[in-house]
């Protein structure tokens, strides 16, 4: 009798352990693959990419990323977008406006979380930034253009004519320049506006601008960001100050910025994506999110190279990029 009871207890214990193992296995997160398409490689978009990945990992989600870079090619974007939809991924991340537009054109059902998009409504990705009403949501890289212009005028107080170079095909760039024009009225400044179509245009365009303006402003433009070392080589040689739309461009030879932190923007987008996967939200009702705090950054090497002395008032609040 004792032996039988011992056998029953032993069997029960084994079955209990097996049940625990089965329960643990069942509780383990099911691996999920999501798509992530990036328009092109440059520091800002790379930082956003890392922010997305880090945020998803921090949430403890068992996610694998199908990482694709379109190399600024529209046909690549289209092919990547269509393949992601065909794979029936439960979520697609898109970095930069053209990437988001391409994925949105490929599907109106799969949830899309985008970042590095200046204005989602202007880009026709959502019906309203506060109430998207589509399968798209995300984080905006709208930068503080007014504060950037104020910094420019502190660094170059006698400036009368400002130049700007951007890609006219990027809606986000046109949106920022429209803001710049309104803000320039406060200082009674004249604007010299030149556009480029691709990276190859930047060198000649920059050469034609330096010497004709007192300073240059460049927005968060993907073509200019990719060509920033080329632009900076020309402007620094001409001792022409360049105020940039974000920190990566400033670090690549610009003089100063009050910039967007693309890593944090990526983290915001990553957490929004995690909420969607966990069933805590849907793009249709998730408002576009924005960065609320910005830091002034000065490229110390560039300042010395072009002979700009940083006013004491600026040194009190700005951080220096060594």
Tell me the role of every PLM-derived stretch.
Residues 2-5, 11, 26-322:
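Short hydrophobic alpha-helices and adjacent helix-cap/hinge residues
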